[in-house]
Amino acid sequence: MEKIRVVELFAGVGGFRLGLEQASANFQTVLANQWEPSMQAQFAFDCYERHFGHRPEHVCQNIVTAKEGIPPHGLLVGGFPCQDYSIAKKGARGIEGKKGILWWEINAILQTHRPRYVLLENVDRLIKSPAWQKGRDFSIILRCFYEAGYAVEWRVINAADYGEAQRRRRTFLFAFRNDTALFREASEKICISGLKGAHQLLLQDGFFAPIFPLYGFERKYSEGWLDEFRYLDLKDLSARQSCHFYDSGLMVNGRFYSVESIPVQFPPCPLGSVLENHELDERYFLSAANIERWQYLKGSKHELRHRKNGTPYFFSEGAMAFPDSLDLPSRTMLTSEGTVSRSSHVVVDPWTQRLRTLTPIECERLNGFPDNWTAGMPERMRYFTMGNALVVPLVKAMGKRISALTEDEQRS
């Protein structure tokens, strides 16, 4: 079998590459790009090179510059920046935001190189972005793929549903070019059977279903034609235009189908299974001085606050588990993990029975990385990079599927 030439964008600490290489020796990374514009020290890129070597095809540049040197490839992968789509960021501007606009660099690569397959990852909110015009950004992304000659299948996957130790919901998009066997099969099914054919692809015969099976669908669904959306130009969708996309869907020949799916849930992997069971440094344990702060952050609130202009308002939020249950998968890790914050996990240490935060190694395990994958960078950045990372075993499963599809095509 010929090697599958891979270009990895927004590579981070290498989660996509690690998963693909665990899946098959048939993947060959011909370019990897990682650059964090807000930081002088490039900790994620340095981590990437510690594991995959100092090579000329590893590029630490702005994607605007780096895309000019992209070689021919068959698979484009990347977890493109999510801050402008994330519910964790107030006022996220979606595809118009500072990092959201990087989508247009991906689109330029699609137009120029037209790789056979594309696998992208983003936050689950991508399909509903922006908040004031739900579905606008995702419809633009689908339109870009359509105009570049691709079909797209997407799925919002909760890693915990498929046996991982973290409840991390992420949108995965798999695009396949219009000269592939998968495209021909999808086109034929939809042409002959319409909505029934789309359901069969999403439930059984498409890209995701064989590796992340579904029980079925809820009654929520939407369908339509991308040509019906009113674009002043591709970046400027009518301000009145919105579309409801659900967590599973398919776009073929400009027509989209989207449904709310019910996953087959694998046996759960509890948070307790990733904890280090030995004596840890005192810095991870909650001190008597800050326990009250933790209790406040994790507790329910209904309190009077004031906006910057002095306007009063009542702020309310419910209580969170404190400490986190060791018998359930963890909550989603954020980049602020390990700090004194509402979102950070607090667990009962199995060695001492005292309350503590998660260690960097435990965060790596929650994302399926080997222990100490991020060792060598400041500890704050170890948490930060894991808060940005994807769950490697999910990519491994998708890598096996892509390798099998490619092998079938090369045989035929």
Annotated model-derived regions:
Residues 62, 187-190, 408-412:
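Short, flexible loop/turn segments with low-complexity composition
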